[in-house]
A protein has these predicted regions:
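Divalent metal-coordination and catalytic microenvironments
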Residues: 3, 25, 36, 44, ...
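Histidine-centered catalytic micro-motifs
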Residues: 31-42, 182-191
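N-terminal capping/lid subdomain adjacent to the active-site entrance of alpha/beta enzymes
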Residues: 29-32, 37, 85, 89-91
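Metal-coordinating catalytic core of metallo-dependent amide/deamination hydrolases
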Residues: 102-223
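Hydrophobic "anchor" residues on beta-strands that sit immediately upstream
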Residues: 18, 32, 90, 182, ...
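Hydrophobic/aromatic beta-strand patches that form the interior of the parallel beta-sheet core
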Residues: 19-21, 33, 114
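Histidine-rich, glycine-flanked metal-binding segment
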Residues: 1-29
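Alpha-helical scaffold segments that flank or form the walls of functional sites
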Residues: 45-111, 134-147
Length: 224
């Protein structure tokens, strides 16, 4: 009933008229959870394959992602949702933008999800609240709170150390703490990223830096 299995047995309960499934020679397992994804990138699979991470991001992914329309994001998310369902996943944790359109795909597919907009520092912008990432995150937070819906949850996204700075990181941590939200971030994907962070921040690794600015004072998912 709703999103709950209410009965497992060998006989149909008297008077029950809802859905039933034949479980002979099968096993019932909890759904898998994809802990880190960028579901609209399903459309870009294989694009720029073989490039080092930072060239792949700056030469291929970031420029292409910037051109994705709302419809692109929705249908790519629907394709990704089909792949999740086929593989036994019931929920996923995502970092992207145009959150409303990913949310629509989540609802239309019947999945669950945690959604976040991974903020990156931009010239001319100061605090986190000046960013589109904040506006989308806060709008989704308010909408979900009003709906009382637990199928979709919102997290606060920080793209990575190398696309951020200390002030923005602290702002993200403060907002997550004030709003009672989780943080979703990329931790340390490559040796290059790791070593350059130490050079920029007086020997601190990405993990140590994130801890210092308070990002690990709230529940956090640190992806690769």
């Amino acid at each position: 009933e709703g999103n709950r299995i209410v009965y497992i047995g060998t006989e149909r309960p008297e008077g029950y008229t809802g859905e039933t499934y034949d479980g002979r020679n099968k096993v019932a397992l909890p759904g898998f959870y994809n802990i880190h994804w960028h579901i609209p990138d399903t459309l870009l699979r294989g694009y720029g394959e073989g490039l080092p991470l930072h060239r792949w991001l700056t030469e291929k992914m970031f420029p292409f992602e910037a051109k994705l329309t709302e419809e692109d994001v929705y249908w790519s998310s629907m394709l990704g949702a089909c792949e999740l369902i086929r593989s036994g996943a019931a929920s996923f944790n995502d970092m992207f933008y145009k959150l409303e359109w990913i949310e629509r795909a989540v609802r239309d597919s019947g999945l669950k999800a945690n959604l976040s907009f991974g903020v990156s520092a931009l010239p001319g912008l100061g605090s986190y609240r000046e960013y589109a990432a904040y506006a989308e995150t806060e709008a989704l937070r308010r909408r979900l709170a009003e709906a009382g819906d637990d199928r979709v949850r919102v997290d606060v996204g920080l793209h990575a150390e190398y696309t951020s700075h200390g002030g923005l990181m602290r702002d993200v941590a403060d907002y997550a703490r004030e709003a009672g939200l989780r943080v979703h971030l990329h931790l340390s994907e490559t040796r290059k990223e790791h070593e350059e962070c130490k050079t920029r921040h007086n020997g601190l690794t990405p993990a140590a830096l994130f801890e210092r600015v308070g990002l690990f004072d709230v529940p956090a998912i640190a992806a690769h």
